[in-house]
């Protein structure tokens, strides 16, 4: 039906996708995923799991990845606003350890395609956010890996939600315990 606009990012493989939105006095309609359109844009993957999470302002989730069952992901915000981040973990990549971030919101309707072998995370900037993501492999809880969100070797520049500092962020105990990128080599 509608075509998509695909923007390449500074890190090869990452893509910011803007769908065509059809709107009138009733509201709007958009295709969030069309295999043929994505394939034509160079994103030829088959998604097999669809997830959605809800979080309040100041929640930071990540940085997560799967070790033996890596996933391509297509992420978007259904309600609210987040700053979404991907970190390149591809062995031999010239951008290994580099990060890229993009503002995703219900208003801008942008989506972020993250290939396999990237760590992924986001911080909620609005009062509330619903986050949806498609994956090319199932979630394997015993295969999960992660990086500490504030690893100085990576240097993600997380924007802080209005009225909050880093100390106010809501981060799971597990996400606080992840090591840095140097620990992945061990």
Q: What is the meaning of each model-derived region?
A:
Residues 1-107, 126-128, 135-186:
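Non-catalytic, conserved peripheral segments adjacent to functional cores
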């Amino acid at each position: 039906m509608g075509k998509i606009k695909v923007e390449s990012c500074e890190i090869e493989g990452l893509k910011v996708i803007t769908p065509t939105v059809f709107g009138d006095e009733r509201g709007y309609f958009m295709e969030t995923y069309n295999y043929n359109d994505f394939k034509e844009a160079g994103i030829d993957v088959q998604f097999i799991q669809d997830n959605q999470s809800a979080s309040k302002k100041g929640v930071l989730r990540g940085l997560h990845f799967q070790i033996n069952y890596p996933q391509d992901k297509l992420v978007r915000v259904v309600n609210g606003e987040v700053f979404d981040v991907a970190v390149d973990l591809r062995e031999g990549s010239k951008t290994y350890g580099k990060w890229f971030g993009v503002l995703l919101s219900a208003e801008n309707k942008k989506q972020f395609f993250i290939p396999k072998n990237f760590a992924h995370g986001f911080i909620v900037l609005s009062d509330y956010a619903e986050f949806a993501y498609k994956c090319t492999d199932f979630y394997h809880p015993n295969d999960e890996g992660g990086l500490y969100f504030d690893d100085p070797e990576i240097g993600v520049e997380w924007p802080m939600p209005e009225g909050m500092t880093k100390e106010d962020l809501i981060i799971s105990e597990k996400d606080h315990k992840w090591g840095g990128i140097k620990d992945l080599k061990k």
